[in-house]
Amino acid sequence: MNAVGIDVSKGKSMVAIMRPFGEIVSLPFEIKHTTSDINSLVELINSVEGESRIVMEHTGRYYEVLAHQLSEANLFVSAINPKLIKDFDNDSLRKVKSDKADAVKIARYALDKWQNLKQYNVMDELRNQLKTMNRQFGFYMKHKTAMKNNLIGILDQTYPGVNDYFDSPARSDGSQKWVDFASTYWHVDCVRKMSLNAFIDHYQNWCKRKKYNFSQSKAEEIYGKAKELVPVLPKDAITKLIIKQAVDQLNSASTTVESLRTLMNETASKLPEYSVVMAMKGVGTSLGPQLMAEIGDVSRFTHKSAITAFAGVDPGVNESGSYEQKSVPTSKRGSSDLRKTLFQVMDVLIKTHPQDDPVYQFLDKKRAQGKPYYVYMTAGANKFLRIYYGRVKEYLSS
């Protein structure tokens, strides 16, 4: 048995090959993440007598090139959580941290856990694309939030509270009514310098041009509030330029978010479990694809507890002797992106309260018992995942 430990970094990796009882087959050496170097590594591993298993840490996205190529070469590859490697066999007072030492440590881990190593599954291109899109979606959502807060901060100095006038959601092209309104009426003087009738006519024409619903009472309310507001920045070309730039940045981020949302739904609809997932309560065309992106292929989980552990919503255990802790925090060792999506699903269930849904009934029961927010939300996420696993696996097997 040959254990190949690979310490992965960006663009290159350190490789060590060992056998039981500390026998060194190959001293640590460096390879680049290029076709020629990877092919040379495959030839070296195949030339070593006996069964070989490759272990590496799944660090960011760096490991995927090696894991994919080595798996394609019909080699046994196992990608391990870095924390498991870090906590393994720390029996020395010396603190040695180098790529060579890490590669040897990973090889020793492979030998020790030989029977328990799980083989890396090459994710099909569709799921890989969906997961990449979801990560980009999360990135641009954060960017959009930052741009939104930036615009509100500037508008508070020219037209305080304008962002609260409308609560309509973003359109498919990313546009929002309050942003379009602030782009046109960027200063409070843009409204109150007109007469009431002139503003109503102007606002009505604006709604017609932008294809928004017009309400005369809303126009009168906006005009009345504008009369009482006190701006800080003057109504001049410089202030207008600052606001226009902030609006353009927000619209750009919002357009990207909505286009990704649409593309993710189109991509997810090609997966076999799409109809089952979309039929679940709390899941729509936005959260459904996000769930499928983060969970991936359900068949790789051997049982329900495996998928809850993957998400990090499984209950912890703290027992020693006669002591047994009754309430233990969840592990939170799994995918933080999946936990975030699950919490959003729970939030939708709480807001829509579908009485016939078992997950909502469970959430409502825990809330009635006086459980803290994070306790009942995490418990609901756990139950939702178990139901998700059961329904999807049953559908795929049929």
Feature roles, as predicted:
Residues 1-398:
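A detector of single, family-specific signature residues
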